[in-house]
């Protein structure tokens, strides 16, 4: 999104929508092995050997759990189902299907008693978005607490499309110790999930954060993953100027919206900014590798 015109023009003439789809294609086995090794190395690097994650019944958490079970063994992975009273029974059923297939440890925590007092306090002023964010943050409270009890790290389940668009709850579902699938677009998640044997009902369902009855990701965003992933790939990975993405045949309003959304949500991808007062400031000039001291 910050290319010079000449660079963008050159790429625009060498890329076409079909080739974008081809470039988004992944090598499933290589990607699987890379992510399994990543999970195993990162968890053990910090002296842990167990992971806890929230299981929504969706494809992202299903893939994450599958990779974690291969990396650490199913006995070292704990999947937590965290329904609210309006959550889809189908989602819980899909989560249980995955748990049975993988043989991982599991638990169910109904977050309704946690959420209702807060919802009652705010009354009718709460929008669906605010309610959904509250539920996402309550779920992460439960998952992190369970990780402490298990002496485990929290496994993230966010994908690259969500990160770039900011389609995530800050300090909710985006909060985790490691994020193995964070550099895979949603369409790539589908391909890898199919390759590693995620159950068919999960593969075929419409993506949904299950934040309120009938909610779907694509319906809420007003975008399809197939299209938005191509636009994001061109803007981010290929670093094309937005105008050249339009010249390739993508809708101008869509491209403009994606650019605006990515830029407006940059703050969600950053750690909190610290005001510099002293001579060495964490995150500015006091910076060491994450495994410093281990």
Locations of the language-model features?
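ATP/NTP-dependent adenylation/nucleotidyl-transfer catalytic domains that generate, transfer
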Residues: 2-53, 63-70, 75-89, 93-294
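Conserved G/P- and acidic residue-centered "switch" motifs that form tight phosphate/ATP-binding loops
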Residues: 58
């Amino acid at each position: 999104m910050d290319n010079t015109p000449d660079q963008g023009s050159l790429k625009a003439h060498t890329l076409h929508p079909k080739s974008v789809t081809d470039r988004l294609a992944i090598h499933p086995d290589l990607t699987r092995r890379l992510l399994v090794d990543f999970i195993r190395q990162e968890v053990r690097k910090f002296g842990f050997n167990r992971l806890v994650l929230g299981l929504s019944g969706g494809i992202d958490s299903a893939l994450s759990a599958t990779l974690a079970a291969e990396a650490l063994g199913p006995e070292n992975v704990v999947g937590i189902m965290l329904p609210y009273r309006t959550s889809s029974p189908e989602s819980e059923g899909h989560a249980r299907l995955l748990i049975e297939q993988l043989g991982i440890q599991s638990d169910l925590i109904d977050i309704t008693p946690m959420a209702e007092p807060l919802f009652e306090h705010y009354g009718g002023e709460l929008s669906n978005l605010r309610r959904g964010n509250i539920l996402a943050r309550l779920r992460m409270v439960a998952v992190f607490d369970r990780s402490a009890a298990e002496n485990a790290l929290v496994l993230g389940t966010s994908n690259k499309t969500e990160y770039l668009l900011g389609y995530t709850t800050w300090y909710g579902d985006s909060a985790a110790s490691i994020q193995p699938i964070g550099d895979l677009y949603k369409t790539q998640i589908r391909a890898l999930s199919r390759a590693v044997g995620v159950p068919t009902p999960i593969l075929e369902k419409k993506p949904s954060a299950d934040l309120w009855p009938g909610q779907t990701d694509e319906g809420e965003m007003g975008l399809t993953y197939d299209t938005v992933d191509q636009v994001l790939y061109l803007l981010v990975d290929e670093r094309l100027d937005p105008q050249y993405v339009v010249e390739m045949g993508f809708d101008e309003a869509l491209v403009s919206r994606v650019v605006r959304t990515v830029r407006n949500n940059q703050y969600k991808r950053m750690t909190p900014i610290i005001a510099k007062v002293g001579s060495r400031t964490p995150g500015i000039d006091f910076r060491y590798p994450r495994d410093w001291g281990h």
